[in-house]
């Protein structure tokens, strides 16, 4: 029996279907339900030793028991957890757990970019060994280490992403929404522009919008070709759904994940806005059905060779969607992906000298062609204020903080701390948190340095210890010394019942 291990329970039925379509019979599909092991909720005791191993306990002991029971009967284990760093951590945990009872069992790792037969076939062609999940492990251990060290010593919540966000907002208040401008034209529709709504500017823009009808109309001076917007990343899609469909960041993330698990959308937790040539070609039939005769797969932005995931896009599976909210998600993601393959659209630009000085830098334009299925819709003039979760999401994305898989979590955490006021500035509480956090920890550059080190060390095949040592070298000596004082002496993994008699319920601790 071949045992296939995936993450989400909601994927099991769909995964069984694509195995059958791919001609794979006699397979058992098991879902971990997410992470098998997790660190304690409390940061104290820290539970990290001087080899950078962290103590974790089973999240759901019943899943651990089921997995080991199934593995004892398998002749091959294929780990198909999500194709991201967290999926790699789960894959490493699965392999480590199974190898304790079946050291001779062949174990393979595949990385599916979508839940479809074609994606499965492609992933099987590139299958390989299970790695150590270094990147995900380093982030988990380092973030817990930072929080456990400085939250207690400083008496305020401290975190790599949270504290950096406070630093960013302190320097530059967050945009609160958008201002849509419709500037009068001599003939035909007005010219458009969209600019960020900054703190303290709402009354000024309200007055300007009310005065638009009294402005001297302008004529088009030149015609330019504008490229179509790129397909959505995960964060792009969450922001779009919040603004245009009224879905909270959490709801949007839940719906996108569900549609992925049903085989409707590609892998969701991506920061890419490009597609592979194969995926671009797959969109051609959908474009024809939508009447987009100008669609050309070659126009879609190419996938960055270093990016593990593609932009969000529909898979074209004929799956009935009855829920109106889910329909909206699919429609907006599909439209963005398909329109990215259309020809650049011509726009008319007014002469700068005919505009008042304040309007010359707005980027005013109007579409030359305003009919047809490929037209770009223009919003009505006005001030569009974003919901608080959209404000925070956009701020995180602009600062490069948080990974796609953690964006909803960080948005919720920041809002729960009440560190922002209605103008997108830090509250008194937020300023206290900022002032008590060491500058080296609240520096947004720490995240950029971490990601660069993870990429470089990963390409060299380095493990957790060397990667962590390289990361620590980016911190000032006094910060490193303070962090090192809270580490525990290296301890061997405790002997467990699973090592004696294959009884998973006896696991006490798991050292990652």
What function would you assign to each model-found segment?
Residues 227, 232, 236-245:
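Structured, charged N-terminal subsegments at the starts of enzyme catalytic cores
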Residues 111, 188-201, 359-363:
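Short amphipathic beta-strand/extended segments with alternating polar/hydrophobic composition
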Residues 1-136, 140, 144, 389, ...:
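Intrinsically disordered, low-complexity regulatory segments
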Residues 110-192, 218-225:
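C-terminal or mid-to-C-terminal helical accessory/interaction module adjacent to the motor/catalytic core
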Residues 1-7, 16-21, 68-71, 75, ...:
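Basic, low-complexity terminal or inter-domain segments flanking catalytic cores
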């Amino acid at each position: 029996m071949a045992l296939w291990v995936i993450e989400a329970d909601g994927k099991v039925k769909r995964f069984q279907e694509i195995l059958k379509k791919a001609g794979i019979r006699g397979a058992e599909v098991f879902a971990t339900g997410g992470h098998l092991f997790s660190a304690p909720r409390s940061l104290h005791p820290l539970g990290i030793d001087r080899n950078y191993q962290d103590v974790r306990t089973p999240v759901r002991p019943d899943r651990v028991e089921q997995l080991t029971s199934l593995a004892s009967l398998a002749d091959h284990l294929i780990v198909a957890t999500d194709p991201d760093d967290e999926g790699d951590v789960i894959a490493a945990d699965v392999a480590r757990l199974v190898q304790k009872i079946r050291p001779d069992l062949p174990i393979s790792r595949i990385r599916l970019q979508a839940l479809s037969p074609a994606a499965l076939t492609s992933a099987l062609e590139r299958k390989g060994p299970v790695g150590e999940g270094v990147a995900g492990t380093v982030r988990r251990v380092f973030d817990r280490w930072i929080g456990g060290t400085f939250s207690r010593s400083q008496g305020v919540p401290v975190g790599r992403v949270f504290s950096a966000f406070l630093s960013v907002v302190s320097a530059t208040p967050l945009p609160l929404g958008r201002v849509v401008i419709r500037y009068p034209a001599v003939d035909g529709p007005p010219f458009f522009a969209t600019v960020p709504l900054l703190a303290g500017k709402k009354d000024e823009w309200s007055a300007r919008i009310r005065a638009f009808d009294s402005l001297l109309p302008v004529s088009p001076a030149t015609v330019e070709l504008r490229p179509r917007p790129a397909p959505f990343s995960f964060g792009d899609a969450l922001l779009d759904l919040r603004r245009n469909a009224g879905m909270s960041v959490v709801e949007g993330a839940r719906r996108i994940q569900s549609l992925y698990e049903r085989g409707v959308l590609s892998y969701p937790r991506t920061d890419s806005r490009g597609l592979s040539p194969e995926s671009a070609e797959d969109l051609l039939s959908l474009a024809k059905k939508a009447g987009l005769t100008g669609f050309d797969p070659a126009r879609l932005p190419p996938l960055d060779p270093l990016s593990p995931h593609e932009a969000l896009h529909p898979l074209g599976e004929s799956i009935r969607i009855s829920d109106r909210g889910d329909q909206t998600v699919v429609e907006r993601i599909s439209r963005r992906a398909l329109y990215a393959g259309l020809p650049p659209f011509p726009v008319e630009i007014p002469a700068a000298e005919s505009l008042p000085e304040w309007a010359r830098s707005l980027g005013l334009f109007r579409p030359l062609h305003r009919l047809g299925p490929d037209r770009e819709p223009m919003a009505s003039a006005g001030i569009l204020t974003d919901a608080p979760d959209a404000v925070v999401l956009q701020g995180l994305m602009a600062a490069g903080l948080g990974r796609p898989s953690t964006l909803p979590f960080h948005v919720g955490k920041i809002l729960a701390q009440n560190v922002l006021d209605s103008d997108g500035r830090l509250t008194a509480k937020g300023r206290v948190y900022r002032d008590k956090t060491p500058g080296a920890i609240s520096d947004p550059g720490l995240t950029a340095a971490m990601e660069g080190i993870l990429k470089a060390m990963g390409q060299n095949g380095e493990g957790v210890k060397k990667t962590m040592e390289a990361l620590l070298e980016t911190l000032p000596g006094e910060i490193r010394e303070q962090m090192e004082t809270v580490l525990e002496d290296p301890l061997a993994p405790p002997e467990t019942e699973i090592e004696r008699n294959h009884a998973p319920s006896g696991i006490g601790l798991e050292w990652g």
